[in-house]
């Protein structure tokens, strides 16, 4: 299998200082809320520390936060996930293999 070096560059999300924009938005919101609640400038240091943690998370896979948000938008919002046993809210039985279709 040949790897195309341009493929990753074309699909890479927008980043700020090594962190995706989704993670940066989370960092800014969390740091701002903590700064407002505590009125202390030490929370800015906590935000910088959180930035380095988020940078280590996105170092190996830059789409990890997009996958997390996609999961939250699909399966994370379902209230009856345990009842149906999956991501679908349909009460119909899911046919999983081709052999089950021929029965």
Swiss-Prot record:
It is found in: Cell outer membrane. It holds the Pfam family VirB3. Its main location: membrane. The keyword Transmembrane helix applies. InterPro entries: T4SS_VirB3/TrbD/AvhB. It is a single-pass membrane protein. One of its GO terms (cellular component) is cell outer membrane. It comes from the Bacteria. The chain crosses the membrane at residues 33-53. Keywords: Cell outer membrane, Membrane, Transmembrane, Transmembrane helix, Transport, Virulence. Induction: During the interaction with the intracellular environment of host cells. The type IV secretion system VirB/VirD4 is a major virulence determinant for subversion of human endothelial cell (HEC) function. VirB-dependent changes of HEC include massive cytoskeletal rearrangements, a pro-inflammatory activation by nuclear factor NF-kappa-B, inhibition of early and late events of apoptosis, leading to an increased cell survival, and, at high infection doses, a cytostatic or cytotoxic effect, which interferes with a potent VirB-independent mitogenic activity. These changes of HEC require the T4S coupling protein VirD4 and at least one of the effector proteins BepA-G. Belongs to the virB3 family. Interacts with the 17 kDa antigen protein that is encoded within the virB locus. This is Type IV secretion system protein virB3. The lineage of its organism: Bacteria, Pseudomonadati, Pseudomonadota, Alphaproteobacteria, Hyphomicrobiales. The gene is virB3.
């Amino acid at each position: 299998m040949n790897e195309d070096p341009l493929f990753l560059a074309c699909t890479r999300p927008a980043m700020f200082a090594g962190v995706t924009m989704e993670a940066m938005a989370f960092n800014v919101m969390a740091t701002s809320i903590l700064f407002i609640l505590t009125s202390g400038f030490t929370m800015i240091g906590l935000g910088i520390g959180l930035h380095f943690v988020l940078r280590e998370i996105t170092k190996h896979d830059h789409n990890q936060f997009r996958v997390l948000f996609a999961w939250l938008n699909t399966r994370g919002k379902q209230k009856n996930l345990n009842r149906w046993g999956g991501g679908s809210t349909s009460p119909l039985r899911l046919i999983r293999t081709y052999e089950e279709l021929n029965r």
